[in-house]
Amino acid sequence: MFQQNQQSQNQQAQNLMHIQLNGNTQLGLGALQTINVKPIKLQSRAQSLNPNLRISERNKQTTQTSSNRQNISNKSPNNLQTSKSGGLQTQNANQKLSSSSAPKKISGNFSSRVIYRAKTKNEDEIIKKQSSQTSISTNGQEKKGEIIRFATESQINNENSTPNSKIQLPPIQEKNSYKFYINSQSSNNQVSQDQSPPLQGLQAFNINKNKENQFTKKRHFDFLERTKVKNQSEETDLLKMHRYFRCKVSNLITGSGKKQYYLQYLKDMKDLMTKVKQYERVAKQNLFINDVMNKLKKIVATRAKYKYKEKIDFTRSIIMRTLGYESRQIIQQLKENMALEEQEYEDLEDDADREYEELKKKQEQQALDKNQKKELISSEIIANWKKMRGYQPNQKVFICIGQYTDLKNYLKEQGWIENPNPESLVFDLKWVTKKKDVDKDLLLDQQITNHFQKNHNLTSKNGIALNLRNLIWYDSVDIDTFYPRCFDLSDVQEFEDFIEEFKFTQAESILKQYVENKLVIDQKAKQYEKYLRLKILLACVALKRRTFSIEKKISLISVNTLPIISPEEWSVLNRQDNNYLFLEQNPDVYHRLSQIITREMDSEESNAVDLSKLAQKYLEASKEYDPQYDLNEKNLWIVKPAGLSRGRGIRAFDQLEPLLNYIMGKDVMWVAQKYMENPLTIHKKKFDIRQWVLVTEWNPLTIYFYDTCYIRICFDEYDPSDLQNKFAHLANNCISKHADNFEEKVNDTMMYLEDFVEYIKKIEGKDMFYSKIQKEMMNIAINSIKSCKDSIEPRRNSLELYGYDFMVDQNYNTWLLEINSSPSMEYSTPVTTKLVKMGLEDTAKVIHHHFVEGEKRFNKNIEYGLWKNIYREQK
């Protein structure tokens, strides 16, 4: 039986196909009629395990190959037929296959895999639609095997895929012909390219097959170095690659419709990450496909691991060119004018320089021998220190750096000793404001500290924005329902995602203002009314594309080298309402855009008389699609320095070009976040909620929630038209205290929770805080911390206090703004004077009882003041 299996394998290798079947199977080859097939040798599983057998079989095949190899022409689908027995035949007399080289059955114990070649430009006569199923019978039973044909870029993958294979990789180059492996045993038709013939352009980067194919930072830069744009063709390929990977969670993976729809979609996909792993197994022979998979994983799940970051170069960004933005020229102008704005950004750059200096010093300190460091501190040294000063051996020592008077007082009441030397290594607890003040390499296991390593993944603005996307894998949580979209503008893919999102929200804003009669034509410019109509219809087209299904979006991306909203379309959507001279002076542009509208919209829609009704239709569809629909009105975005706090460097914009001018030429990492344009207000003023959250363990994850909070209110009334007034948009006390007459109105800038609850009851006639807002804050706190569980370094005797900032919209939905490490504990107002004292004392109770007094074993019935346990991970 073993010899029979080997003979059938050798015959199949001579038959121009590379097929492996799982089990004793019969393959009907009739569905492979129009596929260009290139010969490749087959190694059976036995041959791959036995080198001697492999050599002998190679010698046998060498003598047979020249006589048995035949060419198959695929210029016409009529040239190929399927025999009754399932073999492959041709009507061309000069290229007829002999019966010996075309076996009708294949049997053996190996997995099914088929190679066929991508179609070139000249092969445009191929049949557009072919059967996507091949009959495979095993012991008389029928199985279905999927086949995908990558003939041209315009041949869309989902036409030949099963419902379970919704994401397919588009072919990148159509000028070259390559072979593709398709694993028909898989439900998602995994694809990888063969390394023969020699790869070119973006694909000319081979890897060592014996090494794990992990896309490290060094390899990433090597890949970028080898893929520099050398000609227009390669630039097009590179642009396609970037466009395909701009499938961010909100637009493609989780953005296929309402929450219920896409969560069901992910369930049907059997977890996309599993499919990514399946892709990787097939793709180990070629870096390009493996690069596809790694980028997909980065965008969907693990982008927050900073080793994956790809820093953007604005002067070479393709997406900037599509905007018509001359980066080099703008940067030069900004440098020339920097003297005028130098004072405004001096603090930002100084802070960045200090951070770099601190990081450098820390790295130099870490370079010391760890064993040598350990000799500086031990339990015996601490015991001798206590003995020399007359303290009892069981007395605890603490060091506190910062204004934490209430915490110090409570610990002293419990018999703790304060070590006044902040540089000393003798302590049982060290409470500091900055993590750098504690050297983790010098910590004994029993010493307690109030920071975890790598906490920037949770507390930095770019860190939390990226890590929150991990939630789709933990609990299928939709972050768009509680976190305004946020993008890291220093990262290539994030920046491109932001540009596309800005365009979509701009189109949505145009329709909203038109429906509300805020977008009207000047009576003196009635001749431009047709251009306004064009603008409204283009905005409808943009929203239509935004709500495409995942399959259709991938199809659009794979065949189109331009952004989803093209430069010409954006040139109209981005212009001021009454500035239609551009279209009047460029009738060809108007004509092309009119053709796009005719092609992408129904005739009834493109010729609609009532544009308001049409705009309302697309706005309703957008509302169903986007959980953040109500946040947008005038397309306002807020830009923040990623690593700074206390409102430093924050600006709001409603136009793209001023925003880009603001972030360019400054050595600061920026994030752009959607501005909440429908905030709930208190006496016409914006406000946010400061909530304390405490993590005492990461393994198992244990989270406490402080059972009260306080409200921070902006100094001036909310006015979305005045974006330069920080006192109307930022509620930070460090901002408000600089306002005129602050001392007279200081009590108006903060509110107790009890007063806020009563204020809401007067408006709504019922409680909205405890029944809705607080529950949502708890869920957001749990989910945000869970998203960083794999990124933050756990330590048994550490804890950390976080300050969460929330906002509430007019529908009483709660939104996360940011998370602060070492939140301010200053007595800035009467409200904070009372609550800070309570909060620090209760935190000291957690330290004293939970970590010291033998209550390390978790017990949710133990109370630590107002600290309430809301989450305990099950081991």
Curated annotation (Swiss-Prot):
Residues 517-859 form the TTL domain. InterPro entries: TTL/TTLL_fam, TTLL_monoglycylase. It is an enzyme of class 6 (ligase). One of its GO terms (cellular component) is cytoplasm. Residues 129-138 have a biased composition (Low complexity). Its main location: other. ATP binds at Q673, K674, Y675, M676, K686, D688. GO terms for biological process: axoneme assembly; cilium assembly; protein polyglycylation. Residues 48-107, 125-144 are annotated as: Disordered. Its EC number is 6.3.2.-. Residues 61-107 have a biased composition (Polar residues). Disruption phenotype: Cells lacking TTLL3A and TTLL3B show a strongly reduced level of monoglycylated tubulin and a moderately reduced level of polycylated tubulin. Cells lacking TTLL3A, TTLL3B, TTLL3C, TTLL3D, TTLL3E and TTLL3F display shortened axonemes that are resistant to paclitaxel, indicating that tubulin glycylation changes the lattice properties of axonemal microtubules. Axonemes are however normal at the ultrastructural level. Pfam families: TTL (PF03133). Keywords: ATP-binding, Cell projection, Cilium, Cytoplasm, Cytoskeleton, Ligase, Nucleotide-binding. It is found in: Cell projection, Cilium; Cytoplasm, Cytoskeleton, Cilium axoneme. One of its GO terms (molecular function) is ATP binding. Monoglycylase which modifies alpha- and beta-tubulin, generating side chains of glycine on the gamma-carboxyl groups of specific glutamate residues within the C-terminal tail of alpha- and beta-tubulin. Involved in the side-chain initiation step of the glycylation reaction by adding a single glycine chain to generate monoglycine side chains. Not involved in elongation step of the polyglycylation reaction. This is Tubulin glycylase 3A. It comes from Tetrahymena thermophila (strain SB210). The gene is TTLL3A.
